[in-house]
Amino acid sequence: MSNYFQEFDNKSVIITGAGKGIGRATAIEMARRGAKVIAMARTQSDLVSLQADIGCTTIKVDLSDNVAARAAMKQAGTCDYLINCAGTNVLESVLEMTEDGYEAVMGINLRAALICAQEFARARVASGGGGSILNVTSIAGHRGFKEHMCYAASKAGLEGATRVMAKELGHYGIRVNAVAPTVTMTELAAAAWSDPAKKDPMMVRHPIGRFANVEDVATAIVMLLSSDASMVTGTILPIDGGFLAV
């Protein structure tokens, strides 16, 4: 078994969406375990505070801009790991879905993740292979949630892409996996799920009896990047307290 607090020494990781939520928690956890973190986010103040906390390298970028996304990945250089955490949602019903909503969600959740993965993989192959990609998806890609039309499609699409990446990149020594969290209690989610009428029916569907916190997801991500998971690729790991099991 690896020593997590030594394994990531002298290793570098790109984390998109690192300013808030799961991305920020993962950046903190990877830095705590010795990794050099290159944090990407669109909000400068988030990057400034994260840099003050963990001493990371920061890149301010709007990943919905294809050209900017590729430029940011090239600026980051060849790294050992990529964690695609950047995500967004626009709540629209099937009948009210707009093209703008579709583009906003797909642009960040799917297209940007694929661009970042492609640039990361190209750099790894050019340097001799190896490394690992971790995509953050959602249980929304497995179950139908009201007003999550585009979000569900984007996350299911990223899971499909994860499997294709694992198949195509495996012989270069690059592992590709994903985690699929349930409701995760970021500051934004805590406010959204504060109403018991909304929260309680969802909570009861979790055998473990609670929603996830960002640390639950971050530590699972670290495990999948570690050498303890060296035989794991093409896997979608639910972080859901048993939600998908019932």
Language-model segments: residues:
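Active-site loop immediately N-terminal to the catalytic Tyr-X3-Lys motif
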Residues: 95, 143-149, 171-172, 209, ...
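Conserved glycine-rich cofactor-binding loop
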Residues: 19-20
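C-terminal substrate-recognition "lid" of short-chain dehydrogenase/reductases
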Residues: 172-175, 210-239, 243-245
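Residue(s) in the substrate-gating loop at a strand-loop-helix junction
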Residues: 138
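Alpha-helical segment proximal to the catalytic Tyr-Lys
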Residues: 122, 167-171, 230
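Active-site helix of classical SDR
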Residues: 117, 154, 162
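Substrate-binding pocket helix/loop in short-chain dehydrogenase/reductase
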Residues: 93-94, 98-106, 202
